[in-house]
Amino acid sequence: MQAFKKLTSSAIPLWLSDIDTDMIIPANFLTQTTKDGYGKSLFHNLKEKDSSFIFNNPDYSNSEILIAGDNFGCGSSREHAVWALTQAGIKVIIAPSFSDIFFNNAAKNGLLLISLDKDTVKELCDKAEDPKFSMTVDLQEQTVNVDGSIYSFDYDPFRKDCLIRGLDDMTYLIEHLDIIKQFEQSQRG
């Protein structure tokens, strides 16, 4: 997992609520046995149906932040949705709320999800309509900086530490293997 500390990027405005995992990556693209290759299918059906869909706009092709509406990532528990987003270059999603399962999948795969109040997210989304608009996300400080305005966000301390250090669950366990072995031995008596 790639470490994340701070990012300055333009943002993709996607003010839709209840974006489910099937919208993010349709089920017919889930035929691979590896994690690779899902980014090209991100929002496939929406891109095909609507040529003006924001992910068809080349002005946002280098954006690493997505701003969305309520309940992002709802639907099935498919981890492929997170893989598709990260492989398409998304490193941060800002929304008023996220599905719990999606939130956990994102944290385990290095995708930072930030919950801010709905009015603030809508304001940021409106500003992001200008492709030249940018913001800075600082995980260490837990802030989003927009034109000098600073918005603080909460984030689980354990997940924050793992993301800052680039540790997935397995790497974290391996890093603490000696402590785990000591504990297991102490339990045997």
Swiss-Prot record:
Subunit text: Heterodimer of LeuC and LeuD.
Protein name, as recorded: 3-isopropylmalate dehydratase small subunit
UniProt-listed InterPro entries: 3-IsopropMal_deHydase_ssu (IPR004431), Aconitase/3IPM_dehydase_swvl (IPR015928), AconitaseA/IPMdHydase_ssu_swvl (IPR000573), IPMI_Swivel (IPR033940), LeuD (IPR050075)
- Which processes are annotated in GO (biological process)? L-leucine biosynthetic process
What is known about what this protein does?
Catalyzes the isomerization between 2-isopropylmalate and 3-isopropylmalate, via the formation of 2-isopropylmaleate.
Organism from which the protein derives: Francisella philomiragia subsp. philomiragia (strain ATCC 25017 / CCUG 19701 / FSC 153 / O#319-036)
GO terms for molecular function, please?
A: 3-isopropylmalate dehydratase activity
State the reactions this protein catalyses: (2R,3S)-3-isopropylmalate = (2S)-2-isopropylmalate
* Enzyme Commission number(s): 4.2.1.33
Q: Which GO terms describe its cellular component?
A: 3-isopropylmalate dehydratase complex
User: To which protein family does this belong?
Assistant: Belongs to the LeuD family. LeuD type 1 subfamily.
- Top class in the EC scheme: lyase
Q: Keywords assigned by UniProt?
A: Amino-acid biosynthesis, Branched-chain amino acid biosynthesis, Leucine biosynthesis, Lyase
Q: Which domain of life is it from?
A: Bacteria
Pathway the protein contributes to: Amino-acid biosynthesis; L-leucine biosynthesis; L-leucine from 3-methyl-2-oxobutanoate: step 2/4
